[in-house]
Amino acid sequence: MIETTPLVHAEPAPWPHPRRAWANAKFFESMDWYSHRRLGARKRALFADLPRVVVELGAGAGASMRYLAPGSKLIAVEPNPHTHDALRRNAERYGIDLEIREEPAESTGLAGASVDAVICTLVLCTVGDPTAALAEVHRILRPGGRFVFIEHVGSGPGPVRAVQRLLRRPWRYLFDGCCLDRDTSSSIAAAGFADVRIEPFRFGGAFVPVWPQISGVAVA
């Protein structure tokens, strides 16, 4: 099932600020336990049979590493340098062979048709151009390769949508361009994948603006 919400087009992120980038890196590192509590079972199921070489868009502080098989190689596409020390610590902790790339999700620098799996968690909300990021995923995947994702999305009509609209601008400023109301389901469905499976679910917890979420797999 693919939920439909008003499509929000790409728009430039707020003017970057090093202190905000640092604060975001520290915030998400400190929230690793909460992410594990809320998304751990879903990530474990989605990542269970990934190949030994995986690209992750927006790897952040490495919250997904614990769900990869020890000995896996992770190519972490993460342009925020303030997360890189945490990435290295988590790679050592979970036995992951880590390669960090500072390129943006829209232009990873990886060769076309070179990988079998790309993952991302709560990333397409923040990239400057989600259409370009999805095109890049499709470009670097080999035929039959998988794009595995978990994303928060715009809500359908109701109180949560009202909260998203109310907080949209301050949220976007505080969280490095994160858009609360993107129609990511439609963007993935339109990205040219051979097969797309999307499951809407409710995140729950204290962060009401990101309650509506999706997870799934798209096959190149």
Please annotate each region the language model reported:
Residues 176-192:
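Short alpha-helix
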Residues 197-220:
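Core SAM-dependent methyltransferase catalytic element
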Residues 131-143:
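A short glycine-rich, Lys/Arg-flanked "PGG" loop and its adjoining helix->strand segment in the class I
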Residues 55-56, 60-107:
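Class I SAM-dependent methyltransferase SAM/SAH-binding core
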Residues 33-53, 63-67:
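Conserved alpha-helix/loop element of class I SAM-dependent methyltransferases that forms part
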Residues 116-129:
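A short SAM/SAH-binding and catalytic strip from SAM-dependent methyltransferases
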Residues 106-118:
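A short acidic, Gly/Pro-enriched loop at the edge of an enzyme's catalytic core
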Residues 144-152:
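Conserved beta-strand signature within the Rossmann-like core of class I S-adenosyl-L-methionine
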